[in-house]
């Protein structure tokens, strides 16, 4: 059975420059962004409003039923929070955007994973 992009639910862990640009692009292309997590409410809420998603500042409240989780955090925060981020969501598809973190950071933590690292910088305004 072929799945349409509208059926793919995506959660963003992070709401910085890269997450903002990627979430907006995916949303405008028809993907369903279901939730945004950020440690700051303003960042989470601002991006969530644009992509018509729920938001949270509590990692334990991140949706557990999404098909794709895109982790776009600062590298050090990603490594520190990784066990908490993936708990209960090990069978989803996970990607991170951390340039200095290898893909094998996922090994033994989740079943499906990858790295999405654009070769350019982003700002929220562009």
Predicted segments, located by residue:
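Conserved acidic residues
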Residues: 34, 67, 92
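Conserved SAM/SAH-binding loop
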Residues: 57-60, 118-119
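Proline-centered loop/turn at the N-terminus of a beta-strand
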Residues: 54, 92-93, 112
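Short, well-ordered alpha-helical microsegments
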Residues: 44, 78-79, 102-104
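Rossmann-like NAD(P)-binding element
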Residues: 59-86
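NAD(P)+-binding Rossmann beta1-loop-alpha1 motif at the extreme N-terminus of oxidoreductases
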Residues: 1-54
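Rossmann-fold dinucleotide-binding core
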Residues: 98-126
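Short, conserved loop/helix-junction motifs that constitute active-site signature segments
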Residues: 85-91, 107-110
């Amino acid at each position: 059975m072929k799945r349409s992009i509208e059926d793919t639910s995506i959660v963003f862990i992070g709401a910085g420059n890269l997450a903002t640009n990627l979430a907006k692009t995916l949303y405008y292309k028809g993907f369903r962004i279901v939730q945004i997590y950020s440690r700051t409410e303003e960042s989470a809420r601002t991006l969530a409003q644009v992509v018509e998603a729920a938001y949270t500042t509590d990692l334990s409240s991140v949706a557990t039923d999404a098909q794709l989780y895109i982790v776009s955090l600062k590298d050090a925060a990603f490594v520190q929070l990784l066990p908490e981020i993936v708990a209960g969501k090990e069978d989803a598809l996970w990607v991170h955007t951390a340039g200095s973190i290898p893909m094998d950071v996922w090994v033994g933590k989740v079943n499906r994973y990858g790295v999405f690292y654009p070769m350019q910088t982003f700002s929220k305004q562009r």
